[in-house]
Amino acid sequence: TQYSAEYLENLGLIKMDFLGLRNLGIIAEIMDDINPKFDINKIPLNDKKTFELISNVNLLGVFQLESNGMQNLARRMRPNSFEELSMMIALFRPGPMENIPSFLENRAHREKIKYLTKELEPILKETYGIIVYQEQIMSIARKLANFSYGKADVLRRAMSKKKAKELEKLKPEFIDGCLKNGYDIALANELYELILRFANYGFNKSHSIAYGLVAYRMAYLKANYPLYFYKALLNGTIGASEKTYAYIKEIRSRNIGLLGLSINKSTNEYQIVDDKILLPLSICRDVGSANVSKIMEAKPFSSYVDAICKLTEKGVDIKALTSLIAGGAFDEFGLSRYSMALNLSRVIQYANSTNGLN
């Protein structure tokens, strides 16, 4: 029998979300290409080239940072530390997002930052007077309204689950706590309204740091190992033609070499050959993974006719062979694509008669 998450949570059971992240696979592939002993945990978190890449908005393919909105924020903010990168990721959410102009203004003119009360300064100083993290809400509730750690966490969970009724229920207790601490009711109400607006979609700090770390690592690898970065990125998007086109367009703009299809060298994945990226057979329309496996089994090929004979014997159909010719997979044999396509049926007939004799 299965129960939905909220009932299990009410019973006191621990609920964990395990989410797959293909970017971790991309990072692992890049590390292995650089050096099997390369340790991503030892890269510096203050790499100049990485922050230049982020500030210059060269963010295509970088986790959490490649959307138009995030690129616009990166252009305006130009983060210069890992902590600021994590803040940027936390800010770009429906709750904190409305405070982005104030955040940028305060960051540029820190001497002008004003706090509703001096007790907020140690809580909000790191984020330039703006509420960015759920933990800051908890600290405000504890410091100003005398909430216990447990009660502050109830408030945090109500925010993260967007439970409007529960948030409204906690309001009198928050106001009362503020009044008992000597704050006036206007300030207490203003603080709680801030909390409610933030509740739209606030991140906890650990979440932002974790996302920031993956984003930073991908930006670091793109800045310092672009060839390996693009190769792994393309392998992660095989079958997604729109993304593949965008990545290849950027690769060409950066003067990174691309090698066309080779029936002998290409496989089912992008590879690095002579400091260039070799295209895979799998990008050819109508070829498919099953045919790629057959091609891999039939290699090597000494000529166009030899290739067609072996592939016909393996069961690669004429549609796939036509696509491979059009894609340039047989160009290495020195024949024109036109002549190869024109004579394909005859070569297949020859292959069938030869294979029958064998």
Which functions belong to the PLM regions below?
Residues 1-358:
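Noncatalytic, beta-rich nucleic-acid-contacting surfaces in large DNA/RNA-processing enzymes
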